[in-house]
């Protein structure tokens, strides 16, 4: 799956236009160093890596929350997942409206805080609290709140690196979009693995499953503040 596309990319155009208007090639190691030296990208990745850690932490722990804390069936867990994913098309429209009015930066930071709010509701689903509201209902509300953020999280890893790469290309004259996406992918894969390891350790604690929601909320708030100095993602100026 990786080698095939690479071979196609390396082929010369069939119309004989090879070499015409070709951009100067940047050596691999130099491209990596330039990518990691891009301050805007580092601000972006510090926040995205943190939120991705939290997101993977939650996704990995959701089954434990359902089984060990809420004591609900797989069918009921499916209802919670539906509450999270079914509204995403509408949430993407809302995310785009916020982006147009206040900019992608504000929209992303709002998504982080909204997801944190949803995560803070999950401890209330612990059936040992004997809250008069069903844990399933609270879980559906929590995941429903998080659906806005999930829709945004589908967009961010594609839109932001593309914008950063476009600005970088204007400044350097070299299009290295692929490297920005590659570095992001490697970092996020590492954070996903780290999230799984930390989750395993947390679940050894008696109340570890109850702490999953607040822990994820904390990572989202941290990502919110890490994104504060991101210089791009401002609203588009209205044309008179």
Located regions from the model:
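Membrane-embedded alpha-helical bundles of multi-pass transporters/translocases
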Residues: 1-240
